[in-house]
Amino acid sequence: MQASELTPKWYVAPVSIKDEAVVKNLKAKIQALGFNHEIVDVKVLKEREVHEEVYSLKSGKLPRSLKNTTFNKWFVLDDYRYLRVKISEKNLLGRYIYIKMIYSEDAWRIVRNFPGITGIVGSSGRGALPIPLDEKDANNLEQMLKGISINPSKRIMLTNTAIIEMDSDKFDEKFQYILKQKQAIQKPKEDEDSEIVDAEKLKEAFKKLQNSQEQDEWKEKATIIQSEQTKLDPSVLVPFLGKYEILDTDNKVEQLFEFSVGNLVEVHLTDTIHVQGQIKALYQGTVNKAVVEIELTSKTQLINLPLENLSFVEFE
């Protein structure tokens, strides 16, 4: 066999199911069979996209969730507007993945018979062999695997299964979304009619949107007591065992909740707004309240609220 035939080449393979699942499972299969030297790498090429949506205090609509996640970020723009950034990633080739391998009958058999892979480009027809990428495209792919995009306006993030390309003016060196200064200082239009989310001023938002009775209920149930930097007084905080009546359909039932510091809980701010948080402290005596750390938009807050506003997080 000639030396050129022992050099791994990049091939393109169409997939019929989720691309990254195929890549992950194929890598595991290659490892299990000991074919790492023949099938060198498998990757999907993706592009990260951003969808921005501004929520306004004037609309009166509150989002169901205020939680920051990897692909969902909240930012405070000003006293009235809040920015939701939804991040998504799509396959730049559609339903195709890249496979780097030294072609052999065995390697080809592993790839073409793998669940989710429907062939390799160029291999259709009796006796046809797969066609590798041309030198230019292969070199571009190798450059991206070094974290360098062929487009100077793009940034590259590498994972075990993917090469992810993104705009460098939207994501920093740590691949975090960049909030533009002009977004933060832009004032809302008087006729703006979008939706609302709040961070530091969540309480004020509720006051403006609810009637006076609901305002009093909110004020009683949950008030922001201090920032995350403020220290709690441990002398008044101890683990607590509470027993409360809760409404289950049309019947009142008693349910025992045993909360401890460190528990991950669901915080019921209103009937429709629930966020997850972690118990940082529990009050001594008959106060029956907890200090819970929650994340609203890009801010972390400690709130003080009754234990009946908490429930344990249910994991599927």
Swiss-Prot record:
Signal sequence extent: none
InterPro entries in the record, alphabetically?
A: NGN (IPR047050), NGN-like_dom (IPR006645), NGN_dom_sf (IPR036735), NusG-like (IPR043425), Transcrpt_antiterm_NusG (IPR001062), Transcrpt_antiterm_NusG_myco (IPR010216)
- The answer to whether UniProt assigns keyword Amino-acid biosynthesis to this entry is no
Q: Which domain of life is it from?
A: Bacteria
**Which UniProt keywords are given for this protein, alphabetically ordered?**
Transcription, Transcription antitermination, Transcription regulation, Transcription termination
Question: Cross-referenced Gene3D superfamilies, in alphabetical order?
Answer: NusG, N-terminal domain
Instruction: For this entry, list what GO says about its biological process.
Output: DNA-templated transcription termination; regulation of DNA-templated transcription elongation; transcription antitermination; transcription elongation-coupled chromatin remodeling
Please give the GO cellular component terms listed in this UniProt entry. cytosol
* Family annotation (SUPFAM superfamilies): N-utilization substance G protein NusG, N-terminal domain
Q: Which SMART domains match?
A: NGN
Function description: Participates in transcription elongation, termination and antitermination.
Q: Which family does it belong to?
A: Belongs to the NusG family.
What PANTHER family does the record point to? Answer: RHO-INTERACTING TRANSCRIPTION TERMINATION FACTOR NUSG, TRANSCRIPTION TERMINATION_ANTITERMINATION PROTEIN NUSG
Protein name listed in UniProt = Transcription termination/antitermination protein NusG
What is the source species? Answer: Mycoplasma genitalium (strain ATCC 33530 / DSM 19775 / NCTC 10195 / G37)
Q: What is the lineage of its organism?
A: Bacteria, Bacillati, Mycoplasmatota, Mycoplasmoidales, Mycoplasmoidaceae
Its gene is: nusG
